[in-house]
Amino acid sequence: MNYLLLVSGLLSVWQPVFGSRCGESTIPFSLEILPSGHPVLGCARPTCFGWHPKGYQLPTTAKFSRLNRKLDGFLRDDSLFTYPFETDSSKIYKVQNSTCEPGFQSSKCDSKDQWVGGIEPETDAFQDVAYQCCTYAPLRESTDRNIATVSAGEIVIGGEVYQNESQYAFDYISNIEKSMDENGEVYYEVNIRRFACLDPHNADRRIDEVWSSENTIRKVNGQKPIAQQAPNVAVNAPIEAGTFDGEVVDGQTVVIEEIIAQQGFIVENETTVAPFAGPFQAQGFQPRFGAPQGFQPAFQQPPPQQFFPQNFQPVVQQPVQFPAQPVGYAPYAPAGWQLHYCFPADAEVNVYEKGVKRMDELEVGDWVQALHGKETTYSPVKYWLHRDPEQEAEFVEFLLENGESFTLTEKHLVFATDCQQNVKNLDDLNPTSTGKINIGECFFMAQPENASKFQKVQILDIQRVRKTGIYAPMTSLGHLLVNQIHTSCHSEIDHHLLQNSFFKHVLKLKNRISKYFWNEESNTEGNIGTSLNFLIEIFELIVPSKMISY
């Protein structure tokens, strides 16, 4: 009996030491899924969290295990010291550590004031996963960023967010849900949230975002807000948040550096970018297929106040050449088919570091400008729903009060509203079918003088035109700015995650069939093509009707 009591007592206080844990003084900021399907959790200590007022790190309780000779987590190589600070400072949180569950006991961490502090070790990539949730009160003021779908060989990265070289926020992993697709392949849906996070010794209140973050910290600390000291400054070019296909190298930890300037790029799973040196040291990262040309780990970096971002170098693939049809030939299309065509060839988009491009010049891998929430960001083109330079189609052309025009097909979805309606956040809007928009309503467009803001532009006239060339790009956000107008990538169906997942698998299947029967290599420039109308009809049968706009 005494022996059983002893065993029971030991079991009641025993805590497993295996699995990846960020502990209570670091923050989960990245999640990599190895080719084997096992997750790797990345933990970081930014300037706003995990510090003692005297300037040294709080005790690090992060722990990681090795499974099949691969580590299941890592600590980002952050600075060991910072400047001392006062506990009543308005630029840093009074509470500098989270409170974590004693073990891996949660199926998800879906409370607003939680993040995923640890992941239970997996001996089998197909087993259910348990998480250790950590609670941190300031997260109640956090905002939702997006949900990233991460599969084997992919990684999602958050981290510091910058505006004009001043840090104002940090993107973290709030929740992870493991799922399996119809092919039996495991993927993870990763929730990314953002909370105010300043470098207390390099915080310029003249910048809107820094001023707003300081007031958020003041609110959390129970202090009064401050008034802004100066008007807004100009917006600098953003630094991308890309993804890396890599795995944990034997005997090393993976350290992925991620700095996001301006309002940040939407993290993507398949667009690979060259790593760049940030204010933290990089160590040990080796992509699965070798490092990008010219990549050198940065072992000596300047302090955060000397941060100088490098230029974004996306990997761009060459576009597929589409042969022209013989003169007078009109390809067969089902009734109503051309209504799904989307944009004409002469529609224009802003591409990061490449300027303005016509739609017929756009390539998969280009990062195009988009309005997101209350701000402007960039989002990569993932694939083409349709791309046919020779196809003639009927478009709806809107003549606008600023003297410009905006053209797209009848069933394409676009964001419009009554001009008198007060809209503060574009994420609160639902897109409308082009054919249902009337004269006198307003579109949303990026301000010419300040692209980080949006304004309304009224429709003065509507007419029908015929043009040659139809283009339907799909971005990671599901929308983009076309002729500076905020518009969806979709036709009819207003559900980006479902539609994107559906067509992504269709494109993958099409490429496999092409390779099998015609020995054509798969490529991301390919498009769904003439099967799009049929596929949309199938999608309408399996998607709830309230998600479809008519």
Curated annotation (Swiss-Prot):
Keywords: Autocatalytic cleavage, Cell membrane, Developmental protein, Hydrolase, Membrane, Protease, Secreted, Signal. SMART domains: HintC, HintN. The C-terminal domain displays an autoproteolysis activity. This is Warthog protein 8. Residues 1-19 form the signal peptide. InterPro entries: Dev_Signal_Hedgehog-like, Hedgehog, Hedgehog_Hint, Hint_dom_C, Hint_dom_N, Hint_dom_sf, Intein_N. It comes from the Eukaryota. One of its GO terms (biological process) is protein autoprocessing. The gene is wrt-8. It holds the Pfam family Hint. The record marks C342, F343 as: Cleavage. GO terms for molecular function: peptidase activity. The record marks H412 as: Essential for auto-cleavage. Belongs to the hedgehog family. PANTHER family: PROTEIN QUA-1-RELATED.
